[in-house]
Amino acid sequence: MPARLREIVAVLKQLGIVVEEPKKGSHFMVRREGVRPYPLSGHNGLKSEISDKYIRGLCAHFGLDVDTFKKLL
């Protein structure tokens, strides 16, 4: 199920993962020490809707369980 970027950012912060707002453009950078950055497109800012495909990719990139992540949303 898709989720708002605002909700995703809140969960990532709970998990100790840093989310940087874009200085230019529309991509938020998700960072965790020891892992390369992961860009998340937020064309409408924090109210952007992020598809299930990108949520699964984000979880896979950071080694998070998708079902557990979705329960936190």
Residue ranges and their predicted role:
Residues 1-24, 29-73:
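Basic nucleic-acid-binding interfaces
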